[in-house]
Amino acid sequence: MTDIDAEGVSSNRDLWNAWTPHHVASEFYDVEGFVADPASQPFDSIVREVVGDVSGRRLLHLQCHFGLDTLRLALAGARVTGVDFSHEAIAAARVLADRTGLPAVFVESDVRALPDEVPGAAFDVVYTSHGVLSWLPDLRPWAATVAHSLAPGGVFHVIDGHPTQWIFDDEALEPPLRVRYPYFGDGPLRFEEHGSYAAPDADVTTVSYSWAHTFEEIVGSLLAEGLVIE
């Protein structure tokens, strides 16, 4: 990993550590509503259709943030392990699991180093979703983690935006759409963040780094590890 990539990962970890308490308290995530009645906040229909029946299955949730979706998967009957590199997020996830009484294991780890953190683990399902890939500087170790973590016959589900989604000017208020960012990444993009997507008014300023990955890179990294597309 290059020096700028290492700097970016460290800065992003600081960002998620700073964001986590604001997210736990936000209306966006409605944690208190989930604690009061977990069954009232199931996965949306698209996620349920993609992931299918997980009852009794060993499931690994990569980049799980503070575990809300991980616990939704536990509620659906999965035997879940959630992984995130933010110590604040993992601490909050463990508190949330205790408050709801839902069984879950949470591991603090960079997903690219997970084979060292959970040696020999084998999961029926590996899952990751929504805005996760752009936080990773290199998809090859990520794909290796996915392959290492799957049991024979296991399935990997990834739900994320198409890479072309990220090339347009997200600050433009009027049409037409304008290309602002590169599709073919050559190092990270650096942004100063005020608040967050879930808590826009939060009094927190952070710096994020984002890496562009082409569709070919995403699929190719997984195929190179022996996965196949169903």
Report residues per predicted region.
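A short acidic, Gly/Pro-enriched loop at the edge of an enzyme's catalytic core
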Residues: 116-126
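A short glycine-rich, Lys/Arg-flanked "PGG" loop and its adjoining helix->strand segment in the class I
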Residues: 140-155
